[in-house]
């Protein structure tokens, strides 16, 4: 009697409905699945978790870890928010989507890392929950092929939910995965996925929705390109550093001048985060009253310093005072500015990034 060898696959799992179904589908074929969840630094829910919770006080769960536990599969959590990933963000070969999202390059980067894990684990292939035509940039037929080829996974990247609509992969051709038991889902509708989840007893999953990545957010995208523009203005290298990733998702951002930017904390947690990044920046705080902490980056003129102090004074208990004192601390330099809080909302909004 011929004994079927164990088939092992590496699955990219976000915890969303599609990747959960992809794992369940292959498990039903007897495939040993190891899940992988990549942390890029730009996941909104994970950033909120690390900052202590959402604005309403609730703390989001890690859906990938939850899904792996529910499906009883091993999961590896991989931090890819390193210099290589950040360099890709600034110089994407295939460009950006509507905002600062280099979706195709990001998927190539992830799949290349998944390939390394596949080889290390001795697995047969990599799979994802991607659905043909669901996303306008990264899930077109041509871009799915580009991602497979450029990541080095030619023939070994399976999309189980849309497999019947795509060319057979090596595991399908070799018979280690039964192509007839894979699916032919396409498009943006989730009705088939929801029906399958109900049929298979998968009841706990986040509601299908976009917007989990900061890079797809219009406001974040403005801040992303704004900081690159400031660095070019200052004659610096066009780059994004790890600390920028944190700061871009923290506080209110204002463009004081082409060479200087203000960040104002919105909560106690954000104030504490800004305190941690004060080195190399100017730190501002209103004296004698409760209020926000702020940082100024770049090379502010005297006028920009006063403007920063006035805007900061607007966000605190002293906003209705005739004048307040704002402390400017930059290295060994400590100055105090007596300013009137900025009251022109139109001007504030015009400066907001």
Residue ranges and their predicted role:
Residues 1-199, 333, 342-343, 347, ...:
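ATP-dependent adenylation/nucleotidyltransferase module used to activate substrates
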Residues 156-353:
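AMP-forming adenylation/ATP pyrophosphatase catalytic core
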